[in-house]
């Protein structure tokens, strides 16, 4: 794959903004964007709510064992699409992406597999698709910014931001993601 970020005529620095759900990634990303020194690409939550045959964001949080595989495939592919399409269009020389394909696999999907919400076959399919898309469609980041926020504070923030889909989230789930 041609690296869309780092060709000789188009050198950009790509930062991944990582952290638990409710850690403050969007808030920090918006502060960086307001500085006019960074482009900020938010996690595509609206796509997960409206871009498919149902609100997969809500379906996932309502019935994780049923929707884990579907949601993780969708979340990963929307991020890969973001990297391959949107990054070509941004004009800034410093780009911050909220969350990444690496967290999709190494935190979320891996955790769901470990607790039995994805079976062996689903996990193997997920990993093979992840490897293919990561190698062929996703540029490697230059830096990773990780917000370490206690799970208890993350849960408070999740409740305050008021996304209906997340209101039943449990503290133990956030602790497993740390």
Question: What is each PLM-predicted segment?
Answer:
Residues 71, 76-119:
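A basic- and aromatic-enriched beta-loop-alpha substructure that forms the phosphate/nucleotide-
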Residues 25:
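Conserved lysine of the Walker
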Residues 17:
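Hydrophobic anchor at the beta1->P-loop junction of P-loop NTPases
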Residues 1-14:
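Extreme N-terminal, non-catalytic leader segments
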Residues 34-78:
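Conserved substrate/cofactor phosphate-moiety recognition/catalytic segment
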Residues 20:
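P-loop (Walker A) phosphate-binding loop of NTP-binding proteins
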Residues 106-178:
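A glycine- and Lys/Arg-enriched "phosphate-lid" helix/loop adjacent to the NTP-binding pocket
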Residues 28-29, 33:
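Post-Walker A alpha-helix
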């Amino acid at each position: 794959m041609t690296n869309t970020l780092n060709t000789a005529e188009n050198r950009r620095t790509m930062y991944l903004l990582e952290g638990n759900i409710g850690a403050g990634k969007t808030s920090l990303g918006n502060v960086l964007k307001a500085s006019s020194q960074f482009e900020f690409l938010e996690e595509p939550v609206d796509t997960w709510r409206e871009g498919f045959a149902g609100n997969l964001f809500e379906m996932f949080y309502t019935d994780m064992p049923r929707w884990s595989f579907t949601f993780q495939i969708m979340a990963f592919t929307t991020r890969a699409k973001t990297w391959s399409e949107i990054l070509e269009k941004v004009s800034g020389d410093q780009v911050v992406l909220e969350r990444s394909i690496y967290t999709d696999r190494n935190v979320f999907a891996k955790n769901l597999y470990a607790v039995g919400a994805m079976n062996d076959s689903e996990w193997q399919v997920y990993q093979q698709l992840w490897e293919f898309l990561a190698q062929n469609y996703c540029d490697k980041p230059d830096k990773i910014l990780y917000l370490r926020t206690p799970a208890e504070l993350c849960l408070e923030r999740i409740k305050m931001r008021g996304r209906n889909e997340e209101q039943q989230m449990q503290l133990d789930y956030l602790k497993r993601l740390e």
